Amino acid sequence: MQEAARRASLRKEHTPTNEKFGDLSKQDSLGERASSKLTLDDELYDILYAFGETDAFINKGDKQRETDEDGNPLTRQALLERIRQKKEVIGKLRCQAWSMTRKRRTLKLAQKYLEQHESKVSRSHLYMEEMRKRARLMKRSFSNFKTYLIPWESKIKRIESHFGSVVSSYFTFLRWIVFVNIMITLIALVFVVLPETLADSVANEGRFNRTKTRKQIPANERVHADELAVVWHYDGYLRYSPLFYGYYSDDPFLGNKIKYALPLAYFMVTLTIFAYSFFAILRKMAANARMSKLSGSKAEQYIFNWKLFTGWDYTIGNSETASNTVMAVVIKLRESIADIKKDAHGKFRLLQFSLRVFANIIICAMLGFSIYCIIFAVQKSQVQDDGNLFTKNQVPSVVSTITHVFPMIFDLIGKMENYHPRTALRAHLGRVLILYTVNYITLIFALFEKMTALRDRVNSTSTSSSHRTKRQQGGWNPNMQRPPPYASRAEVRQMSDFLAANTRRFQTVSQRTTRSVTTPFTVAPQFGPFNVNNPNAVFHNGTHSTSFESQILGPKALPIFTPPPRKYPGFTPGNVGQQFGGPDFPRNQVYTKSTPLPRVRTKPPWVYTTTHPPLVQNRAMTTTMSKSAKKGNSKNLDDDILLSNETIQMSEAALRRNHDGHNNDICWETIIGQEIVKLVTMDLIFTILSILVIDLFRGLWIKYCSSWWCWDIETTFPEYGEFKVAENVLHIINNQGMIWLGLFFAPLLPAINNIKLIILMYIRGWAVMTCNVPAREIFRASRSSNFYLGILLIWLLLCTLPVGFVIASMSPSRSCGPFARYQHFYTVVTREIEKRVDQTVLSYIRHIASPGVVIPIILFLILIIYFLFSLVRGLREANTDLQAQLVHERTEEKKKIFELAGGKKNKFEKDRDKKRSNDYIPLIEQRRREPWRQYHEMEADHALASDSSEESDINEDEDDERQPLTAYPLRAIETPPETLQVTAFHPSLGSLIENREMEDEESASGDQLPMIHKSVSFQGPSHMQMRQSISTESCSQISRSAIQVATPEEIRALLRPYLEAKYGIPYQHGIKSFPIDVHTPPNNTPSRRSSKYNSFVSLYEHTRDDHKNFVASTIKETDEDPGKSDKKQTSSKDVAPDFMPWPSADEARALREKMKSKTPLMLTKTTVEEKPKGGKSSESEFRPPVPIHRKYNIQTTEEENEEEETDSAPESSKKRFRISVSPTKTIAPASASRAQHKIVSQASSSSSIPHGRQPDPNKKASLVLPPLRAPRVQFDEDDSPRQID
């Protein structure tokens, strides 16, 4: 209250005494506004007016503003408050719905006030305000500068100006994916890669020896590590890099002082990345949901308005794109019109149905073919040293080809289906999405099958600890004194199969072994490990060891030769135990005798060369002879060393072709990581190739060949390449799914993906601006942004399933990765929990984690989810119902407002009201309202007009002689002609009260009254009925009485007995609403609307008939010969009104002031009495048909007749009157003996006499009507009328 009083005082202070009328109206409006509760806009509005709106006003009111309402100078607090108000005005100015001129003027005034008064508070305060101002400017400048730091913002804006916001949404989505991958990469780098690298940089000798096999490439692989095929396979140096799983050590802790658990960190980082991805996607979807407009229901209500007024893209800055957008809007409008006109059930077409079935069969066959190709490629993929590029990379090549080629084939197949363009687009997107999903699932299953085979192979070679130690050392640890060159990791069975399948024996005529008497032993020409140069063979009398592996070592292979026969010293025959040798030698051989051979002495080495055509590759073998072991009864052999070169022929199948030889052990996690990284890389290459071939080369061909080609290739086929936003977004989603899938096996895969996405950003942007055109059918990003994010969320869920299966079910590799020490991947978490949690609590946790508790919890969560879905569905339905209710109420309120304002109803509303009113109209009333009656019913139907008992007393002979009733035109008045505004009935008592009076300004002649310039609606009989002659013996009396107010409830109470008796059911509803009426055309003909003609509710439609331009006509009875009674009389003045000039402004102002004057009305009843005449008097009578429940009898008394005689004496004392009928009162006749003819007055929408019934001005007036008057009443607080004397 104090604030309101202060504002009021400010208004008084700043209001000059010599203000003009407009300024006073402003201050009056402000005073009215101050009395109510002000909103923020009102406060700002008052502040602006309180401090003035012009510079002159500010200069003149400075002295007054420096004082408060008491005249005292303003205190510092008050001045600060005013300064705060001004700052609030400046801060909220941008949000005001004002014109720009007013905003600038207000800003200027507020700033000027602050400049003048801020220094008066205190200098320190002024400095603080200046600092705040500078800080705001810096903040704003920094916010503007940040826009330049957003990556690719200018490129995206340029694309948006040429192609619109739909195409730019793809690049915005791509940029968001890049940001997400950058965050994932930072998480992996900080918590996994960086600790491992730091630990290696300060590693001691023990850690170096433990991790050397994982982090350093072996010497045999270093030779080929820089070859293109090895690098393309992500092998060589890349395999032993932090890119893959196998690089990381399995030490429980890193560092001595700061113990960092890398296995636990690796596990938790994987979970954190998936959680962050979920959070980022859901947060983006929520932001889009908040920013989106809930225009679904609105678009359904106003289809064409939304498409027309919101279909334009204001970001377009290119003329060609603008013309394309115009055509797109036109096409959408045509499609909407076609959809509206299209029948619900289209005609069945057999050919079209057959084509659609055939197209779906082809698409399903292509999906099956893609599944077969992926499975076949995964199963047959091998890492080879030779072969073409496709055989080395079958899996990524096949998957990328299917991803890029099949969607284009789907698009071509979809054209034969002849769907609606919008339906065809959605079907194509659905098929592409199904293709990506099927390929993804197939690839996962194929990789898991391959992984299972690799794990089984690893498990078969790790049956004992000795085998595991030998496999881990692999023969290449220089710190160990062993092993010999033939140390093997292979299994005995595998080695035997390998040798049996890949070894060819020499065919010689002589014996294969030669025994010399002088030598203690015999050396076979074929023995020892394969492919070893300069062999040193040792014959042992011990157990044969068959576990070995061949290695590719040393320089180039030596040529094939056959050693010359030699003689050896004799020896005693006996058993010779073999430690090693080829499969051609049995374990124990007994030589009974020796066959002497010719001895040839040569100096070693002996080199002989022979040629074998089927040989594929040469291998050199070195054999070393050492001390022999002693076994059983075998005799000791002499120590000797034999140097010889032997060559063994190997078939093509014996060449090393699998990946087992590239590493000392099989690390299946790294192998899967390599496959996924190759998929991502191959997808980038295929994307670049598709852009070059499909977009660039096609664009060049069309540009330079369209002028001379045999058909129009620019507009028909192949056209310029379209940038398909939806397909490209699905491609990005598929690529991101691969990243999430391979994240566990390759921690730095998101970094590679960032490089790929950046390349895509630039090459796609270049292709769009150079080669592409906007697509004809647009899948709008504004409506489908959450659709894309929803697909991305589903893809993330699909990626978490296989990774979760690996973590929960698979056993890690024993020789690589951070989980090599554990039985399962999740064991690292369980062990940490066991270390840090009490056993009692741990037992409870185990019980809770048991299936007996987890399964019910899962079921309970499913029920909760179902309940929430049901709740959301119910709320959505309730929201729909509320929207429908709001729309209905809005429509009804609009209709009421238009009715109150005199608006018209449209055809639909009229028909609806007509249908509603039929439920409450009696049958006799419906017959009376038939449209043909106003044209063809020559005489009033007594059966339909009235059922009054007094009508039977009327003399029927009076109908023989009739006289037409005519009405004189109205007298001209000094008011401008204007159209009468028709208002609907409003159920209040004030609608029946007349508030205006009009002075009698009849001319001295009084013969002719010109027609008024108004369009008045009159529900009455037709012209033919108006001109029917009536009997001259009958007389017509018009009774005038004061208006009696009747509420709608009273009218319903009067109608209820009749309706219950008529229909036999209790009447429940009254008159729901009174229909409005429309004004007639300029010819002033009565309304012919059947629903309003002779309607019983028309009384309330026009409750104010004494408008300022309206004067009731006077009905005069004329003496006419009986012979002339049937003759129709017309007057030119009845057809068209006389010309009346518009009144001047002074006349209109005087008339308005005269209308505002308040004059008490006559409350006495006046009647019109017919003057006595000799003989038969001819009267004009009209009997419109009236329903039973709306008929009123108007009668007069002798006192009224006498009063009429006194009122009609002088011409100057004649006053106009209005025929007003009370809907609930019937006046009984005063004298029954007197012959009277009653006029059954009908409740019409206007009480004025229609122009069709205007009397002939040439006839003598026999009836003089009193002036139009009505009692003046006022209303109390209970809405009850009270008459004013």
Swiss-Prot record:
The record marks E160, D313, R780 as: Required for interaction with calm-1. Residues 696-720, 766-773 are annotated as: Required for interaction with tmie. Disulfide bonds join C667-C816. It is found in: Cell membrane. GO terms for molecular function: mechanosensitive monoatomic ion channel activity; monoatomic ion channel activity; sodium channel activity. Its main location: membrane. Keywords: Cell membrane, Disulfide bond, Glycoprotein, Ion channel, Ion transport, Membrane, Transmembrane, Transmembrane helix, Transport. It comes from Caenorhabditis elegans. It catalyses: Na(+)(in) = Na(+)(out); Ca(2+)(in) = Ca(2+)(out); K(+)(in) = K(+)(out). This is Transmembrane channel-like protein 1. The chain crosses the membrane at residues 165-202, 261-292, 350-381, 389-416, 421-455, 668-705, 725-745, 749-771, 786-809, 853-886. Residues 948-961, 1197-1208 have a biased composition (Acidic residues). GO terms for cellular component: neuronal cell body; non-motile cilium; plasma membrane. Homodimer. Interacts with calm-1 and tmie to form the MET channel. Glycans are attached at N209. Expressed in the ASH polymodal avoidance neurons. Also expressed in other sensory neurons, including the ADF, ASE, ADL, AQR, PQR, URX and PHA cells.
